[in-house]
Amino acid sequence: MEQPLCVLGIETTCDDTGLSIVIDQKIKSNIVISSANLHVKTGGVVPEIAARCHEQNLFKAIRDLNFEIRDLSHIAYACNPGLAGCLHVGATFARSLSFLLDKPLLPINHLYAHIFSCLIDQDLNKLQLPALGLVISGGHTAIYLVKSFYELELIAETSDDAIGEVYDKIGRAMGFDYPAGSKIDSLFNKELVKPHYFFKPSTKWTKFSYSGLKSQCLNKIKQISANKTRIDWSELASNFQATIIDHYIDHVKNAIKKFAPKMLLVGGGVSANSYLSNRISTLNLPFLIADSKYTSDNGAMIGFYASLLINGDKN
């Protein structure tokens, strides 16, 4: 009897430590331990602190999995992109397990795993290729042309800040704890959105740039804070969110015109944003957005994508 495909997925690219058991492309357990509370004071991730937390959390997480690791068939880990120290901790842990258990080791691209996370718990027959892979997270903002599980072509990326990073910096200026994306999204009111409240970034469609919008928004926050003691941030939050998401969608529209994809695959922490999902639904293409359990960094998406690659090799 053939052994089931049983993959351990390891995620340590930023501040979330993730371990998951994926058996025959089904998520059997998924442990995520975040160190975000340790980064609240700085308003962003401190790489050295995050790496030390991974060292402690990986051993706790593997105990919490409550799984006999000798039954694994493969070990997969996020190898790039990410914070160097955090990646090193995850890679060392994965290599050590691979050596001790004599199991095959698969290095996995973190962004590709985000893209295909929208297929978790889905019928894979829904996948239509070529597709556009949309990555919108705290560390990355990009669009990929997805030709197969193995072949992804980068067609647009940020030249400075990622969307999620801007959300966190704007949220910090408004007095919100890190991470701030969900708080800003909760304040969104379409009725408060005004034309030209902020100037939309002007860039080539193959590049995103959000540093200018970030500066506009921070200056506006300073003006409002100087003139008011009690502040309702709803108007500013609504216009900020509309501007930054609409700009991203403009790039997606250009990519659709150029590459004629059959569907959209959406992943990353910002994919949980309500306005983003609303705008994507207007693009007249089938789309899949990752379940909220899998939008932030997690081991399940690493193990799941590894399973897709392994099965592809078998076929």
Swiss-Prot record:
Swiss-Prot/TrEMBL cofactor(s): Fe(2+)
Subcellular localization, as worded in the UniProt entry: Cytoplasm
GO biological process, one term: tRNA threonylcarbamoyladenosine modification
Substrates-to-products reaction catalysed: L-threonylcarbamoyladenylate + adenosine(37) in tRNA = N(6)-L-threonylcarbamoyladenosine(37) in tRNA + AMP + H(+)
Enzyme Commission numbers on file: 2.3.1.234
Stored PROSITE patterns: GLYCOPROTEASE (PS01016)
Keyword Glycoprotein recorded: no
S-S bridge residues: none
Main location (coarse class): cytoplasm
Family according to the record: Belongs to the KAE1 / TsaD family.
Role noted for this protein: Required for the formation of a threonylcarbamoyl group on adenosine at position 37 (t(6)A37) in tRNAs that read codons beginning with adenine. Is involved in the transfer of the threonylcarbamoyl moiety of threonylcarbamoyl-AMP (TC-AMP) to the N6 group of A37, together with TsaE and TsaB. TsaD likely plays a direct catalytic role in this reaction.
UniProt name for this protein: tRNA N6-adenosine threonylcarbamoyltransferase
